[in-house]
């Protein structure tokens, strides 16, 4: 998933392969009817809520494990090449923290734009718009400074 976290996640399935066959060729067939794919996407987006429902609390093991793997990558271990939240400022998305196609290694965090279908990219655009709205609300409430002043706090932004 890319973009925001929670209901505004952009679930990308177009690069997934099942037994060597692209998922996009399976969706809408008897093997994976469109309705089942939609349910699967919903289950991915609502996975955290399901864990809380089943356990009565959030899961801490997976984030803890990923954190250790991220630290290991930055310290010289195998690169961590899973989507992760990163500060994004490019031609399309400006001044936002969102999950991207990232790699963490001894050079830090780098990202590239996810590649997806037009529908997936539209979901990512919608997720970005939602994140911008949330960011702008935080600015309005004086919780964070206006974007144009961020580089006063961190000159790398």
Regions inferred by a protein language model and the residue ranges of each:
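Long, compositionally biased stretches enriched for glycine and/or charged residues
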Residues: 1-157
């Amino acid at each position: 998933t890319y973009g925001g976290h929670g209901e505004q996640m952009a679930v990308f399935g177009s690069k997934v392969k099942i037994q060597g066959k692209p998922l996009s060729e399976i969706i809408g067939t008897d093997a994976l009817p469109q309705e089942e794919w939609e349910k699967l996407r919903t289950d991915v987006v609502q996975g955290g809520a399901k864990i809380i429902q089943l356990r009565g609390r959030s899961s801490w093991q997976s984030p803890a494990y990923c954190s250790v793997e991220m630290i290991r990558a930055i310290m010289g271990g195998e690169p961590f090449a899973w989507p992760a939240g990163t500060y994004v400022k490019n031609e399309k998305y400006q001044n936002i923290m969102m999950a991207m196609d990232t790699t963490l290694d001894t050079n830090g965090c780098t990202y590239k734009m996810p590649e997806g279908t037009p529908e997936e990219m539209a979901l990512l655009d919608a997720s970005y718009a939602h994140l911008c709205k949330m960011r702008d609300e935080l600015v309005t409430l004086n919780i964070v400074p206006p974007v144009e002043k961020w580089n006063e706090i961190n000159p790398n932004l």
